[in-house]
UniProtKB/Swiss-Prot annotation:
The gene is hslU. Belongs to the ClpX chaperone family. HslU subfamily. GO terms for biological process: protein unfolding; proteolysis involved in protein catabolic process. This is ATP-dependent protease ATPase subunit HslU. It comes from Bradyrhizobium sp. (strain ORS 278). A double ring-shaped homohexamer of HslV is capped on each side by a ring-shaped HslU homohexamer. The assembly of the HslU/HslV complex is dependent on binding of ATP. The lineage of its organism: Bacteria, Pseudomonadati, Pseudomonadota, Alphaproteobacteria, Hyphomicrobiales.
Length: 434
């Protein structure tokens, strides 16, 4: 769990996302409150519940990107899901409890990777011994093993092929699927796990010494880990630090004066209520309490309104943040300011072909103008429009770059207008092309 202050979290988000100060403040405070809660006495800690967030704003303004960057920053189990993927209990499809099961799997993977690093040195030595066994045999003399160990560490044997015994991942086991629920898994128990543990099968693989390195280290690391303790720690991390980002929540609103076809939409909202309020979900690894999992919901709310959500669900999302539509200046900043801005990406991509791409300031202004103009006349898809416009403008350069190694390609405002100006002005054409 990160111990960054809210100000530091906002400055980290500023490196990748332009504007939206209110949303950044809200998520930074929520993330810091996770850390603050863990500093409290046990009794009070149980009483402090997370303040869930509802982000409201048009598409393409940074809602999902804020969540994505927050996940990397938090170092906590994080899951992004679309609310539209779930159906009411009793209907065909995934039920909302699958969110928590998936979050537990994410946490187990995170905890395992962290613990593998702790035992990496011991696992490295054990893996080295297994490689030497494959090269010279388990009964070889100490002198022979030392000689080969020196060659192995010097990298002289990297290309040599060896046969190693590895744990079978149970690939031969048929998948157990619940009829009528594609992609659903048994929550309480996994049939594959039972047979995998009973079988304990190994298989022989023929790989190079270099390729065997990662396989054997991962296997030896797992032997040194206590799997029960690992799972228990992962569940504890989920219960105290887990974050769920519920995207497209406006799509499960039941709009006023609308009848028929919406039964399972309202049902999904009702199923989400106990999950967000706090309940216990059964997973194949054990029971997980959701009382202290932070939920961040987001939606464009173009057609529906936040008030169309069930009143109980509105009450469980107490912090409302409105994200602003992007202006021309925002579009310009998005092209240049973030660490991995679109301009930097295209320049780097062309450099791989030996082509220097020179995009002038007036070209950046022209690109921003075109994106804003098309957004206002066709459909406002926010910053995503910039990708469409950039692809259109740089289409010729991308296609012929491999034939122009060593050249410098200059893109200015005139070049932008030549390749896209007429399309942007013609609303009917841009409706289909941009």
């Amino acid at each position: 769990m990160t111990d960054f202050s809210p100000r530091e979290i906002v400055s980290e988000l500023d490196r990748f996302i332009v504007g939206q100060a209110d949303a950044k403040r809200a998520v930074s405070i929520a993330l810091r409150n996770r850390w603050r809660r863990l500093q409290l006495d046990t009794g009070l800690r149980e009483e402090v519940l997370p303040k869930n967030i509802l982000m409201i704003g048009p598409t393409g303004v940074g809602k999902t990107e804020i969540a994505r960057r927050l996940a990397k920053l938090a170092g906590a189990p994080f899951l992004k899901v679309e609310a539209t993927k779930f159906t009411e209990v009793g209907y065909v499809g995934r039920d909302v409890e699958q969110i928590i099961r998936d979050l537990v799997e994410v946490a187990i993977h995170q905890v395992r990777e962290r613990k593998r690093k702790d035992v990496a040195a011991r696992a490295q030595l054990a893996a080295e011994e297994r490689v030497l066994d494959a090269l010279v045999g388990a009964n070889s003399s100490a002198a022979t093993r030392d000689s080969f160990r020196r060659k192995l560490r010097a990298g002289e044997l990297n290309d040599k092929e060896i046969e190693i015994e590895t744990q079978s991942s149970g690939g031969g086991m048929p998948m157990f699927e619940i009829p009528g629920m594609p992609g659903a898994q048994m929550g309480a128990i996994s049939i594959g796990d039972i047979f995998g543990k009973l079988g304990g099968r190994t298989k022989t693989r023929r790989v190079t010494v270099e390729a065997s390195h990662d396989i054997l280290i991962a296997e030896e690391s797992d032997k040194l880990l206590d799997s029960d303790q690992l799972v228990q720690e992962a569940i504890n991390v989920v219960e105290n630090n887990g974050i769920v980002f519920l995207d497209e929540i406006d799509k499960i609103c039941v709009r006023e004066n609308r009848h028929g076809g919406d039964v399972s939409r309202e049902g999904v909202q009702r199923d989400l209520l106990p999950l967000i309020e706090g309940t216990t979900v059964s997973t194949k690894h054990g029971a997980v309490k959701t009382d202290h999992i932070l939920f961040i919901a987001s939606g464009a709310f173009h057609i529906a309104k936040p008030s169309d959500l069930l009143p109980e669900l509105q009450g469980r999302l107490p912090i409302r943040v409105e994200l602003q539509a992007l202006t021309r200046d925002d579009m310009r900043r998005i092209l240049t300011e973030p660490e991995a801005s679109l301009i930097k990406q295209y320049v780097a991509l062309m450099k791989t072909e030996g082509v220097t791409l020179d995009i002038t300031d007036d070209a950046i202004d022209a690109l921003a103008d075109v994106a804003v103009a098309v957004n206002s006349t066709v459909e406002n898809i926010g910053a995503r429009r910039l990708q469409t416009v950039m692809e259109r403008v740089l289409d010729d350069i991308s296609f012929t770059a491999s034939d122009r190694t060593g050249e410098t390609m200059r893109v200015d405002a005139a070049y932008v207008q030549q390749h896209i100006g007429d399309l942007a002005k013609n609303a009917d054409l841009s409706r289909f092309i941009l």
